[in-house]
Amino acid sequence: MPRRRVVGQRKILPDPKFNSELLAKFINVIMQDGKKSTAEKIIYKALDVVAEKKGEEHLVILEAALDNVRPTVEVKSRRVGGSTYQVPCEVRPVRRNALAMRWLVEAARKRGEKSMALRLAGEMLDAAENKGTAVKKREDVHRMAEANKAFAHYRW
């Protein structure tokens, strides 16, 4: 426990185009080497491509994609008596969002399309339809938690 006061979480400014804090956070996740304007271009282009293909509102599709990627449980390593157990734990809401965004971006970076905007758009479309690499990652994490349910009593 820290002796000083607990520092609160910083408020993030909403993005300029859609006025969304979620999208601003997503831009920060995509950003590399501090190049925020490049990250914004990538995301806005990807959202335009997705909205054109789906015919829905930009943020609705992003929210649907993130909903299908958000994990509810994960495993954490816990050392008990010389052996390490994978203990299933519930994921806090802030971490759920962070993991979902990170997994979406990682999956998009591994895709084969030409530009990052197209890769991200493809991954968001796949995630919105409950398929794709990011959704598979979430299901793998859930499967690990389910397999280690016997160690749930070691939760802290």
From Swiss-Prot:
One of its GO terms (biological process) is translation. PROSITE patterns: RIBOSOMAL_S7. One of its GO terms (cellular component) is small ribosomal subunit. Keywords: Ribonucleoprotein, Ribosomal protein, RNA-binding, rRNA-binding, tRNA-binding. GO terms for molecular function: rRNA binding; structural constituent of ribosome; tRNA binding. InterPro entries: Ribosomal_uS7, Ribosomal_uS7_bac/org-type, Ribosomal_uS7_CS, Ribosomal_uS7_dom, Ribosomal_uS7_dom_sf. Belongs to the universal ribosomal protein uS7 family. HAMAP family: Ribosomal_uS7_B. Part of the 30S ribosomal subunit. Contacts proteins S9 and S11. One of the primary rRNA binding proteins, it binds directly to 16S rRNA where it nucleates assembly of the head domain of the 30S subunit. Is located at the subunit interface close to the decoding center, probably blocks exit of the E-site tRNA. This is Small ribosomal subunit protein uS7.
